[in-house]
Regions:
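Short cysteine/histidine-rich metal-coordination sites, predominantly Zn2+-binding motifs
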Residues: 40-46, 50, 108, 114-117, ...
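Aromatic-flanked redox-active Cys/Sec active sites in thiol-based oxidoreductases
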Residues: 21, 86, 101, 116, ...
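Iron-sulfur cluster-binding cysteine motifs and their immediate structural context
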Residues: 26-38, 94-113, 124-141
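Short pre-active-site segment immediately N-terminal to redox-active cysteine/selenocysteine motifs
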Residues: 23, 31, 87-88, 118
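General detector of N-terminal leader/presequence modules that precede the first folded domain
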Residues: 2-23
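Long amphipathic N-terminal alpha/beta scaffold segment
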Residues: 49-94
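Flanking helices and flexible, charged tails adjoining ferredoxin-like Fe-S electron-transfer domains
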Residues: 5-11, 72-73, 116-171
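Iron-sulfur (Fe-S) cluster-binding segments and ferredoxin-like electron-carrier domains
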Residues: 11-18, 29-64, 135-139
């Protein structure tokens, strides 16, 4: 039993490496690791990662040795990042709380700002902003949702650091 679990854990890590690590919840799971767990342990569909598109679905099917037909998408989306219209920002801090990678800085009742290099384009801040002062804009440096491994690793690292920090605050 432990050998089977060990193999499943290794497979889960490989799936996690294939996911873009946006932590965007578009797959309906709270984060990429939860989705990877669902694929391994609950036989979840492989096509639920919208940002990863067919590219990620194909990688995961190869990891699982599943011979599924993946509909290739030639469409390359602009890689968006969030932008705050600072004059309209009320400093509510909601965006700071929902950002999975701590890419937003600011204080209560003060203007907030996006750290462009850290923003992974998850759009969680956009949907939560109560005054609609945020928008997604193209990031010229990153022109596709198909993140290379280095960017995904940075996003995963920032997310894990936020989890550790927020867990310490709650204690």
């Amino acid at each position: 039993y432990s050998i089977l679990m060990n193999n499943k854990e290794k497979t889960k890590e490989r799936i996690l490496d294939a996911l873009p690590q946006l932590q965007c919840k578009k797959c309906t799971y709270k984060d990429c690791e939860s989705y990877a767990n669902a694929i391994i342990f609950d036989n979840e569909k492989l096509n639920k990662c919208e940002p990863g598109s067919s590219h990620t679905e194909k990688q995961i099917s190869n990891i699982l040795n599943k011979n599924i037909k993946v509909i290739e998408s030639n469409e390359i989306k602009d890689f968006p990042i969030a932008k705050i219209t600072v004059e309209e920002c009320i400093g509510c801090t909601i965006c700071i709380k929902v950002c999975p990678v701590d890419a937003i800085i600011g204080a209560r009742h003060k203007q907030h700002f996006i750290i462009d290099d850290q923003c992974n384009g998850c759009e969680l801040c956009i949907t939560e902003c109560p005054v609609d002062c945020m928008e997604m804009i193209p990031n010229e440096e990153k022109n596709s949702w198909k993140w290379p491994g280095a960017q995904a690793n940075i996003s995963k690292k920032l997310y894990n650091e936020k989890l550790i920090r927020t867990h310490r605050i709650k204690e």
